[in-house]
From Swiss-Prot:
This is PEP-dependent dihydroxyacetone kinase, phosphoryl donor subunit DhaM. It catalyses: dihydroxyacetone + phosphoenolpyruvate = dihydroxyacetone phosphate + pyruvate. Residues 269-477 are annotated as: PTS EI-like, N-terminal part. The keyword ATP-binding does not apply. GO terms for cellular component: membrane. Residues 156-243 form the HPr domain. Residues 1-135 form the PTS EIIA type-4 domain. One of its GO terms (molecular function) is phosphoenolpyruvate-glycerone phosphotransferase activity. The keyword Metal-binding does not apply. InterPro entries: DhaM, DhaM_N, HPr-like, HPr-like_sf, PEP-util_enz_mobile_dom, Phosphohistidine_dom_sf, PTS_EIIA_man-typ, PTS_EIIA_man-typ_sf. It is an enzyme of class 2 (transferase). Consists of three domains. The N-terminal dimerization domain has the same fold as the IIA domain of the mannose transporter of the bacterial phosphoenolpyruvate:sugar phosphotransferase system (PTS). The middle domain is similar to HPr and the C-terminus is similar to the N-terminal domain of enzyme I (EI) of the PTS. The IIA domain of DhaM (via phospho-His-9), instead of ATP, is the phosphoryl donor to dihydroxyacetone (Dha). The phosphoryl flow likely involves HPr ('His-15') -> DhaM (His-435 -> His-170 -> His-9) -> DhaL-ADP -> Dha. Its EC number is 2.7.1.121. The gene is dhaM.
Amino acid sequence: MIGLIIVSHSKLLADGLHQLAAQMQNKQKCHIITAAGVDDETHPIGTDAVKVMEAIESLSDAEHIILLMDLGSALLSAETALDLIDPDLAEKVHLCSAPLVEGAIAITAAASGGASIDEILNEAQQALQAKQQQLNDTVTTTENEKDKHTHFSEQALTTQWVVKNPSGLHIRPAAKLATLLSGFTATLELRHGEKRADAKSMNQIALLQVRQGDKITLVAEGVDSQNAINAFNQLAQHNFGDNIATTDSKTFVGKTAYVPTVAGLAHHHAPNTELCISSYQTSENETRRATKAIEQLKTHLDSLANTLNEQYGEEIANIFRGHRLLLEDDELVESITQSIENECNTAYDAISNIFNNMSKQYQQLDDEYLQARFIDIEDLKNQLLMSISSVAQPSCAFTEPTIILSGNLGPSELLRYRNTNVVGVALANGSPYSHTCIIAAKMGLPILTDLGDNIHQIAEQTKLQLSIETRSLIVAS
C-alpha cells in the first residue's frame, strides 16, 4: 500500500484536493491523508511539522509514503518532520516536487493501479506535460523520451474503439483505463493517430488528447495480452467509467438552456397524517408487523431503483439502493425488536422512536452534507409508518403548471410529482445538500430551500413565480 500525504498551508485547499484525488483512488492500494493549516482560528494559514510527523506515523504500515508540498515552508515542515521520526520509518518517505494538484492525481491513479514506487514518482514528475502540451507550452523531453516507442512482434494483439465520451479521454476515464491495465503482465500501448502512449500511464494517455469521435487502438503483447484486450473492450463498452447519455446509434450533445424563472399555481404538499395507530397486541405480532413493513419497503425500493436507473441514471438509483441498505442494518432491526419486546411498544411506536432518534443524531452533525441525510431518515420512517397503517401514497394530477410548497420534502415524496405538471418546488426548510435537491435537479425541477415558515400562509392556487436566479419565490399581485 502507498501512502500519500498532502502538505499545504490551507486545510481547505488540502481537503478539496483530497476529495478530487479520491475520484481515482483504490483504497486497498492507496491511502490519502492531509497535514494542512495550523490550529489557530484567527490565523489558520500555515504549516506544522508536528502535524506532518503525526501524518507520517499514521501511515507507518505503508510500503512507501509520498509527501506532496505546496510552498516553501511546507517543504521545510516536511524536512523537519523527517528529522523527528524514527530513521527506519524515514527511509520509506519520499518528498515529491511534482505540482500539487496534477501530482496528487497522478500519484493516486498510478498507486491505485499497483505501479511501483519508481513508476509512481515518474508519473508525478510528468504530470504537467498534458496541460503544457494542450496550451502549446514548452515541454522539455530527452532524446530517449522521444524515441521511447515500443516495438511489437507479429504476435501482438490489437483492438480498436471509437470514443463516445463527450469530453474524450479526460482525466477520470484516463485514470480508470490506466488503473485497469496496470494489473496485466503485458506490454500495452495506446495509439491515437501517430501518437503513442504507455497504456498503463494516466499522464501519457492524457497526452494523446483523445476527443469524442476519435479512434484509438490498443496494442498488447505478453502473457496477459488477450485478457488485457478483453478488459479494455469491456471498459470501453462502458465508456471508460463515464456515465453518458446515448440514444440508439447516434449521440447528440448540446448545451443546457438555463431557465432562471418558472411560474405556476401554489399547491401545498400534504403529508400523510391519517395513519392508523393500533393498540399493542403481543411482542410477536408487533415484531411481525414491523418486519413485514421493512420487507415490503425493501422490495419497493428495489423496484423503484431499477425504474429510476432507466429514467434518471445510476446516480439517482443508488440513492434508493442506499436506503435499502440502511433497512438491512442488523443493529437497526435489533433496536426496533428490542423496543417492542422490552418497552412493550407497538410496531408503529418502535419504528417512530428509533427513526426519530436517528434523525436527531444526523441533525446534530457539523458536516452539512451528512446533516442533510436526516431528510432521508424521516422519509424512510414515514414510508414504514404508512405501510404499517396500510396507507398508500396518493396519486397527483395537475391541469395547470404547479409549484409545490412544503416544510420539507423527502426523496420518495418528491417522486410523487414526476411526470406531472409540477414545474418547481419551494421549501420552508430543507437543505440544498439533500438527496431531494439532487433528484430535483435530475428531474429538471428548480427547487428553493430555507424560505421560512411564511410560505405556509400562501393560499392554495395562488399564482407564483420561482426564480433560481434571484433565489426568491414571488407571489403575483
